[in-house]
């Protein structure tokens, strides 16, 4: 323990003179000497109650003694017979425990987080103890409040602010909201009361018991102004009244207050759960809510003005970089993202900071500095208040209290403490300004740049009007831009936009127009952005996102200019605008092997039993990942092969999650097939064909899937609703198809085509592995064996995967007559061309026409089926590029031809990706890709036409 500083050692002599009889300087420990010198509150208390000092000297306070508060208070209230004795015992108990906490805090016997916890538990214990005693007393007098069904109704108390967050300071008032569940009347008393009357009287008596000063002091100053309608509203509200208020009139600052709200006492009963469920949507919005930024700025501005008005200097709570700014920083993330990130819904600041770090919402160093600063400031605040049990956050001006604080904070002197404090508050202020900033107007340069565009936006210029800021555009482009602006304004007149929405739009549009019209393709870009804006003008939070984050606006303009597909996706699903905030992730897709893990974490935010939210979350995750892949594609950071790799890995992660969800639902209903009891896995596999099987998915590709199982004929499920095992797998596959195809507000997940299964659409949706093998060996057509070349298991346990791989290898390595195979493959290609060929004779269909992608695929498939019995290694891969490599490595095709076909294939696929980004069909002018087409046609003739 740090020895007392010189000023405090001198002050000790004053303390000695006030010590109670029986206590001498030599009889006191160093710890007692330190605490009594530091805290006048502790000194006054032990003078009034000398036994407390003896108790502290013999048994120091413990970190976990808050667990005993309720039991100790129950003993103290055992003999209470009226309100007066209740008030006396509550005050006595509070003072005794506060002295113990001051002792532990001053001597650093427990850490600062635990001190906050002890202070909060003490308050909750006193509130609940007083409520329960008074509730019983009121019931004896007026009867028990009941609903119409006769069910007793409790008084629920919401602890707000630091009390709710478990972070109460030493000398704090307490913010409470009172509620009761249902209307009704009291029963069993001397007179009947309406429930509203009963709970109002109970609330009034509770406030008096805690708040009214007596000769013993008070327990806590009680502040009820956070309740609906504040001081002018009812003291206690029913659940229905609370719900109506927060749905219809709840204000931003009430959302912030409600973040920390916690029900006092036993809060896991049905009434408590109902109240929490009712309040949660008000506090944590399902969508990303950027209106928080401006609202917190406004609140901070009000506080700053109050600090100036009241001359509050050296205020460690409200000043720049103080406790309130740390709270604001944390609340920004809670209120913007808390609806989608349950880890941000903690009432306490420090766990929420941990969640912010885990979600990478702030740099690690910033989070570390905020944590250290918060604990430093909270310790300083508590020590300051414990000197006189006084509610203050203003640093002292007198030398004695400055010396006390310097010693308590383990600084050598006051200047050193001020220096440390200044550093911490500067760190907080920096993060606060970067995140929230001051509510200041644009800089003069920004104002000068945006002002003429404000005129363009607000003055509704005609097509033939001239304005200097559009002079750089060609006449036709200028007319198009003005027409688009005019049409957009007309469209807005049809939309129910509130005052806040119009205000934000008027702030946003000058900046947007300035950026868009600086581009050569201004008209095209604006034509893609205005439909998006028209779709979000009634959802102000998205406008605020673009207004608050210029970087997001810049990326929006760039991506919409590059791709109408992206513009359409953003317009259809505005939730994706959130992805524009972080260019570090926007242009860096998830690592290919990390999609499953990221999706798993994403789905943890959604209750497993909530199917609707699960479906929505799957679709939102997919759309966000597609946007990131497309952005990287546009930026040139992903080559064509990598684009398809990412799209394929994403699809596999989705399949994994959908099967998991379907399996969970089926097992809950029927149990699992009994043959799985003695083995690992699920006896189920999903096989991907076509582009999925070949690692070649495009942006809008559907999924070609078949489903396999290995369930014996006579197996039943082991659940209460027993069904045949094979019927279980059929229903599982049907459930999977349903989960993929169900249309939610975020669309469908994927189009799934299961027609490549044995016997096609006429066959069973799910097939046993044995039946699949038999079909492939005895009934399948050559084109089905071609399809098998590009097939692989995308979900399945190892046993079934191995079974499928064996069947595939066996079929592909079967010896075939070369001439017959050549004829069958060629005839199938001709049928496809006749059925799917290009209807635009003056255009080249990149996929279907001669010399296109399908020809390359057929060449590869033919050669594998033709030569795999001689070269089994040809069966290793299912994608065309690596098959071409294998053909060269095994001497089937010369290396030059294989390389040339690979280049042609990737070039044509790259073009298809880019056409998809432009929302264009997959055909180009006949003159395009003539070199690649000639090469493919020559290879086709060599392998599939030559005699």
From Swiss-Prot:
Its cofactor is Mg(2+). InterPro entries: GlnE, GlnE_rpt_dom, NT_sf, PII_UdlTrfase/GS_AdlTrfase. It catalyses: [glutamine synthetase]-O(4)-(5'-adenylyl)-L-tyrosine + phosphate = [glutamine synthetase]-L-tyrosine + ADP; [glutamine synthetase]-L-tyrosine + ATP = [glutamine synthetase]-O(4)-(5'-adenylyl)-L-tyrosine + diphosphate. One of its GO terms (molecular function) is [glutamine synthetase]-adenylyl-L-tyrosine phosphorylase activity. Residues 450-947 are annotated as: Adenylyl transferase. Its EC number is 2.7.7.89, 2.7.7.42. It is an enzyme of class 2 (transferase). Belongs to the GlnE family. Involved in the regulation of glutamine synthetase GlnA, a key enzyme in the process to assimilate ammonia. When cellular nitrogen levels are high, the C-terminal adenylyl transferase (AT) inactivates GlnA by covalent transfer of an adenylyl group from ATP to specific tyrosine residue of GlnA, thus reducing its activity. Conversely, when nitrogen levels are low, the N-terminal adenylyl removase (AR) activates GlnA by removing the adenylyl group by phosphorolysis, increasing its activity. This is Bifunctional glutamine synthetase adenylyltransferase/adenylyl-removing enzyme. It comes from Salmonella gallinarum (strain 287/91 / NCTC 13346). The lineage of its organism: Bacteria, Pseudomonadati, Pseudomonadota, Gammaproteobacteria, Enterobacterales.
């Amino acid at each position: 323990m740090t020895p007392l500083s010189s000023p405090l050692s001198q002050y000790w002599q004053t303390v000695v003179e006030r010590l109670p009889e029986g206590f001498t300087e030599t009889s006191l420990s160093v710890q007692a000497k330190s605490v009594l010198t530091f805290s006048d509150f502790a000194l006054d208390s032990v003078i009034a109650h000398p036994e407390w000092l003896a108790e502290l000297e013999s048994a120091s306070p413990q970190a976990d003694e808050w667990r005993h508060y309720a039991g100790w208070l129950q003993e103290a209230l055992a003999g209470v017979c009226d309100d007066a004795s209740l008030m006396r015992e509550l005050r006595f108990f509070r003072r005794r425990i506060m002295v113990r906490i001051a002792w532990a805090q001053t001597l650093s016997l427990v850490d600062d987080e635990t001190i906050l916890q002890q202070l909060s538990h003490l308050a909750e214990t006193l509130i609940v103890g007083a409520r329960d005693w008074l509730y019983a007393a009121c019931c004896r007098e007026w009867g028990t409040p009941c609903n119409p069904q006769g069910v007793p109704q409790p008084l629920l108390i919401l602890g707000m602010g630091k009390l709710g967050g478990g972070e109460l300071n030493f000398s704090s008032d307490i913010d409470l909201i009172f509620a009761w569940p249902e209307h009704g009347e009291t029963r069993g008393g001397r007179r009947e009361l309406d429930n509203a009357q009963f709970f109002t009287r109970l609330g009034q008596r509770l406030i008096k018991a805690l708040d009214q000063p007596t000769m013993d002091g008070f327990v806590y100053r009680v502040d009820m102004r956070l309740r609906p309608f504040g001081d002018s509203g009812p003291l206690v509200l029913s659940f229905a009244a609370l719900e109506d208020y927060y749905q219809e009139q709840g204000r931003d600052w009430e959302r912030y207050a409600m973040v920390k709200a916690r029900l006092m006492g036993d809060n896991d009963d049905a009434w408590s759960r109902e109240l929490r469920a009712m309040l949660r949507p008000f506090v944590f919005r399902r969508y990303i809510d950027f209106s928080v930024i401006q609202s917190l700025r406004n609140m901070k501005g009000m506080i700053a003005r109050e600090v100036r008005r009241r001359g509050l200097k050296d205020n460690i709570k409200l000043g720049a970089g103080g406790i309130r700014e740390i709270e604001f920083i944390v609340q920004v993330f809670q209120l913007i993202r808390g609806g989608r990130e349950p880890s941000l819904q903690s009432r306490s600041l420090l766990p929420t900071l941990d969640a912010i770090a885990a979600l990478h919402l702030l740099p690690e160093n910033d989070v570390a500095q905020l944590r250290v600063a918060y604990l430093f400031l909270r310790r300083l605040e508590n020590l300051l208040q414990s000197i006189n049990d006084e509610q203050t956050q203003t640093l002292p001006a007198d030398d004695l209290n400055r010396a006390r604080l310097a010693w308590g904070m383990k600084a050598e002197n006051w200047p050193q403490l001020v220096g440390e404090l200044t550093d911490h508050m500067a760190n907080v202020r920096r993060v606060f300004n970067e995140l929230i900033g001051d509510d200041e107007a644009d800089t003069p340069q920004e104002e000068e740049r945006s002002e003429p565009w404000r005129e363009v936006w607000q003055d509704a210029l005609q097509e033939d009007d001239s304005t200097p800021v559009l002079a750089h555009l060609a006449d036709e482009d200028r007319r198009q831009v003005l027409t688009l602006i005019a049409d957009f304004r007309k469209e807005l007149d049809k939309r129910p936009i509130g005052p806040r929405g119009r205000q934000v739009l008027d702030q946003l549009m000058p900046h947007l127009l300035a950026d868009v019209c600086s581009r050569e393709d201004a008209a095209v870009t604006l034509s893609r952005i205005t439909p998006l804006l028209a779709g979000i003008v009634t959802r102000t939070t998205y406008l605020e996102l673009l207004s608050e984050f210029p970087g997001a606006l810049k990326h929006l303009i760039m991506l919409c200019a590059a791709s109408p597909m992206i513009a359409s996706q953003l317009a259809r699903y505005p939730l994706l605008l959130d992805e524009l905030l972080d260019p570090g992730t926007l242009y860096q897709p998830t690592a290919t092997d990390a999609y499953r893990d990221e999706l798993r974490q994403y789905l943890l935010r959604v209750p497993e039993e909530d199917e609707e939210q699960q479906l929505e979350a799957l679709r939102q995750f997919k759309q966000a990942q597609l946007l990131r892949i497309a952005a990287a594609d546009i930026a040139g950071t992903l080559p064509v092969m990598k684009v398809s790799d990412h799209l394929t890995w994403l699809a596999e992660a989705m399949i994994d999650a959908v099967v998991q969800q379907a399996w969970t639902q089926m097992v809950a209903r029927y149990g699992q097939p009994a043959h799985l009891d003695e083995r690992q896995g699920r006896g189920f596999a999903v096989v991907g064909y076509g582009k999925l099987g070949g690692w070649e998915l495009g942006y809008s590709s559907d999924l070609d899937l078949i489903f396999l199982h290995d369930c014996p004929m006579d197996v039943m499920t082991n659940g209460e609703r027993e069904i045949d095992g094979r019927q279980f797998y059929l229903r599982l596959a049907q459930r999977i198809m349903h989960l993929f195809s169900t249309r939610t507000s975020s669309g469908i997940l994927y189009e799934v085509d299961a027609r490549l299964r044995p016997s096609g659409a006429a066959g069973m949706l799910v097939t046993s592995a044995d039946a699949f093998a038999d079909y492939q060996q005895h009934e399948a057509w050559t084109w089905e064996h071609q399809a098998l070349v590009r097939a692989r298991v995308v979900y399945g346990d190892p046993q079934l995967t191995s079974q499928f791989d064996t069947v595939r290898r066996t079929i592909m390595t079967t010896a075939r007559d070369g001439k017959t195979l050549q004829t069958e493959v060629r005839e199938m290609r001709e049928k496809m061309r006749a059925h799917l060929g290009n209807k635009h004779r003056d255009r080249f269909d990149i996929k279907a026409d001669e010399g296109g992608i399908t020809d390359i695929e057929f060449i590869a498939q033919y050669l594998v089926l033709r030569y795999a019995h001689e070269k089994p290694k040809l069966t290793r891969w299912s994608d065309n590029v690596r098959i071409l490599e294998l053909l060269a490595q095994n001497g089937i095709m010369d290396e030059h031809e294989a390389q040339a076909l690979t280049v042609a294939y990737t070039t044509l696929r790259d073009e298809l990706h880019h056409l998809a980004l432009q929302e264009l069909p997959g055909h180009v002018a006949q003159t395009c890709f003539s070199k690649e087409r000639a090469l493919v046609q020559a290879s086709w003739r060599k392998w599939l036409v030559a005699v």
